[in-house]
Amino acid sequence: MKFIINNNILIKNLQKISRLLVKNTSLPILDNVLINIKNGMLSLTGTNLEIELVAMIQLSTEHISGTATISGRKLLDICRNSLNSSNIEMQLNNNKMHIISGNSRYILTTLPYDSFPVHHDFHHISEFFIPSDILKKMIEKIQFSMAKQDVRYYLNGILLEKTDRSLYAVATDGYRLGISKFFLKENIIPFSIVIPRKGVIELYRLLNIPKQPIKVLVGKNNIRVHIEDLIFTTQLIEGQYPDYKSVLLENKNNFITLNSKLLKQSLLRAAILSHEKFCGVEIHIRNGQFKVLSDNQEEEIAEDRFNINYTGNTVKISINVYYIIEILNSITSENIFLFLNNANNSIQIEAENDASILYVVMLLKR
């Protein structure tokens, strides 16, 4: 193996791949990057077993095909300490990687490439194209609703499913629920998968690119996304995701229109003295007035109110204040619709000018 590559190009791709590298005493090869040259294409692969990322780079200079694995962190450090515009020359000799950068020389140890774990056996059951900005938005609007280290492991991620002609992304921790959807023009094979939390976070980072169509391949145990010159693959979570549609309101006649900014400001004021553990506030809606009350373990009290256009029945509910604030942070419309549940166990929130997202938040027992 032998090739020459511009340091700018190499470091740009190594920075993305290095996020996956882990120091594992029982499996040291996970700290390595798999380097492969075939048919004039250089591929760099990093994995943490759950997620795999492959960077594809077209070589424009003379090269010799081959495969090797070397420490990703050490290679990245070499690149970072080299001139940005310089060329990096790499050559494999007697299972040692010889690297030349300007006036510097390095010799790195390699590990057997055939023990590097890769997703060679990926087979997809469904595929589609989606604009990168749309998929990024779908994740962005609901990812805060994902569970963190929940024993119900299927909640520690996002449900991605295709039903009818729409693609749905769903996240819930059992106390709140976020749903975003996108209409697919093409008719694709239906699927329902759960992407793990770490995979969701990494995919969201990779989608920070100019708007362009990206290809998504859905497998039985993995999902693969082609993003520019990157191939992202992550394992899926097994298990039956809860029936999220059962908590959605069928009757939407009982709702209140609220100014997003006024509501957020009021909640932030009340949150100052909310209970540190439960973060609960009481909301009273009556006679055209929206009132928020909070207290804490030190018997301190906060109250804030603002006027609204509402003449219906008196409403009294208790709710986690930060759940609502996080929702308001993700909504860009001037107003929101707050739908009341007749069973008085949850509320549903929708943006005034964006029908593609909605949220459900469970109420606290008073």
UniProtKB/Swiss-Prot annotation:
This is Beta sliding clamp. It comes from Buchnera aphidicola subsp. Acyrthosiphon pisum (strain APS). GO terms for molecular function: 3'-5' exonuclease activity; DNA binding; DNA-directed DNA polymerase activity. It comes from the Bacteria. PANTHER family: BETA SLIDING CLAMP (PTHR30478:SF0), DNA POLYMERASE III SUBUNIT BETA (PTHR30478). Forms a ring-shaped head-to-tail homodimer around DNA which binds and tethers DNA polymerases and other proteins to the DNA. The DNA replisome complex has a single clamp-loading complex (3 tau and 1 each of delta, delta', psi and chi subunits) which binds 3 Pol III cores (1 core on the leading strand and 2 on the lagging strand) each with a beta sliding clamp dimer. Additional proteins in the replisome are other copies of gamma, psi and chi, Ssb, DNA helicase and RNA primase. One of its GO terms (cellular component) is cytoplasm. Belongs to the beta sliding clamp family. The lineage of its organism: Bacteria, Pseudomonadati, Pseudomonadota, Gammaproteobacteria, Enterobacterales. Pfam families: DNA_pol3_beta, DNA_pol3_beta_2, DNA_pol3_beta_3. NCBIfam families: dnan (TIGR00663).
